[in-house]
Design a protein with these regions (language model features):
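A general, composition-driven signal for non-globular sequence regions
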Residues: 1, 7, 24-26, 35-46
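Gram-negative bacterial Sec-dependent N-terminal signal peptides
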Residues: 2-30
Length: 210
């Protein structure tokens, strides 16, 4: 395996905050379900399964980058990094960004010289310990708490809930508004029921949708 490049940078806001606070995500609500493993799904063991209604649960994997003493620091790691004379940077190959409890994975990430925006492409996954959001294209405005994400799927770990949405925005901490969206508590690949609506509001702390 070739050498991977790592770096830390100070930024003003959290990555998940940038992705969910006042953000808009573009996706197809009725797209095909993602594979269970892509949604951080783990099956119960034989002994555990006997006492459970569902076949498994959603579990966030371990962080790939270590935590920094200063939670404002943005850590970067990638297989290849190209720096331009004007300060722009292009990261390629299994890119990982982490700040505080938020971690982002992508195949390619572009950082402008001012580091106020992140443009990511390819197999994107954003996790913060409570939620997972996946897509193929994302634009994060780090200093404005705004972002857009294409082809999005989401998981709320503790609520055993997953879904898709045309537009997803966070209206308050742990509260989300999804437009042209669906959600279900069924196991991945088993949509015995799902709610499909032009407007769904989710409360992550309470675990309900309206």
């Amino acid at each position: 395996m070739g050498k991977r490049f790592s770096r830390t940078l100070p930024v003003a806001h959290t990555l998940m905050g940038s992705l969910l606070a006042g953000a808009s995500f573009t996706a197809v609500a009725q797209a095909q379900d993602m594979p269970a493993e892509a949604l951080d799904w783990q099956a119960w063991g034989e002994e555990e399964a006997a006492n459970q209604l569902c076949r498994g649960r959603y579990v966030m994997p371990s962080y790939r980058l270590p935590a920094q003493e200063n939670p404002e620091i943005l850590s970067l790691e990638a297989s290849e990094v190209d720096y331009a004379a004007n300060g722009e940077a292009l990261l390629r190959g299994d890119v990982v960004l982490r700040r505080g409890n938020e971690e982002v994975e992508a195949e390619r990430v572009f950082l402008p010289a001012d580091r106020e925006q992140v443009d990511a492409e390819g197999n994107i996954a954003i996790r913060d310990g409570r939620a997972l959001v996946r897509g193929e294209q994302a634009m994060l405005r780090l200093n404005e708490d705004r972002a857009t994400l294409g082809n999005s799927h989401y998981v709320l770990y503790d609520q055993h809930l997953r879904g898709q949405a045309n537009q997803l925005e966070q209206t308050a901490e742990g509260e989300y508004r999804l437009q042209d969206a669906s959600f279900t508590t069924c196991d991945p690949g088993a949509n015995s029921w799902q709610l499909v609506s032009s407007d769904i509001r989710l409360n992550q702390a309470e675990g309900f949708g309206t």
